Amino acid sequence: MVEYNTICIAGPFITVRASQIQNYVGAKYQDDLKFPYGNDGTHTFFAKDHQYLKDSLFAAGSQAQIKAHAGSFVKALELYCESVPDVSRKGLPRVLIVIEESSDRWTNDYKTIEMELMANYSVYCMRASFPEIAREARVDPESNILYFRGKEIGLVYFRAGFEEGPHIVTKAEDLADGPDFWKVREMIELSMPIKLPSIDFQLATFKKFQQQFSDRAYLDKVAQSEELVNRLGKVFSTIWSMENLGVEGAEINEVYKDAIAHPENYYLKPQKEGGGNNLVNDEIRQKLQDLDDPELKTYIIQKRIVPPLVDTYHCVKGGYYVSESFIEIGIASSLFTKFNAATESSPATNVVIDSQMIGMFCKSKDSSVKEAEVCKGTACLTFPLPIPTALIQEKSKGLAKGKLEMTVKI
């Protein structure tokens, strides 16, 4: 696993649209697309008609992913209604999407889920920036219910505030001229709506957890069993915090030396979510050598994964180009937890209420660029064509039973 994002749910929506284009191309040019199976004349491309795929979240072009994502929002609103009963409430409360004030280039990412929620669940979404929330939101002092523009809010979905900066007021004039963003966030966190994500996950980011989970000594201390230690150790790529740089005996000291000598083997990442932040190659060496930089200890360093490369057609702005690319597969899921405060007899706990896999997407990333991003045209969304093992065995008798769980065709 390269990373674990706790905020974005965008990819599967747009990927479903991309798969429709791929289906069209596959159907129109099936005789020219030489897939490895189907020597009996039946092209593997049409494995998408298999019943397994029709009923699966993996079905190319399927609306199942969109429905599953919307269903997770509805589940959150239902849990909210259970915890905040109100006999006068008609239908489900609204979703408040918190966005950046100046620009929001990701609007199309979540418009799909807005339409799905409204069309099939009669759930309405409202978008607002921190300043707008400061001006137009209020919390009922008795029920602790959050209202925005007079409407009850059951779920707050943060598309802004990926770092601590927007929440902190450092100058007196900021208090006079604008809202205290931290106070706005505090108001939201202390009110009743379910938060996506909660502030502890959003500000820490999962990179911090990933760093801890890659530490065998830490896992030995906190994991409940040796089996769990081994499972987690296999999932997370090697990653180190810069916080311990210079501490005697810390593993990061040797990693630091190796990263300066061989920066091509590492990524240097800030504790942020979202793209465009990673440092690579000579950028790593320059950053690591500036030991006086106060930001340095907020970074984490990760061993670089070198995936296989394939020649890929990237369709961008009405044209295309061919490049050596690698494929990144993302799995989307929903996780609901309930926090139980510590008591005299027991520590604080987070209890898992529900956990579901709700979709997937793929990106073809140009290997020649520093950090491939779809919005910059250096990566393209794509969709896999999974083929059940049984179908592969049916088409190719020479394949060993159980050798493949699924085959992905891009």
Q: Where is each model-derived feature located?
A:
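Domain-scale recognition of functional cores that engage charged ligands
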Residues: 5-404, 409
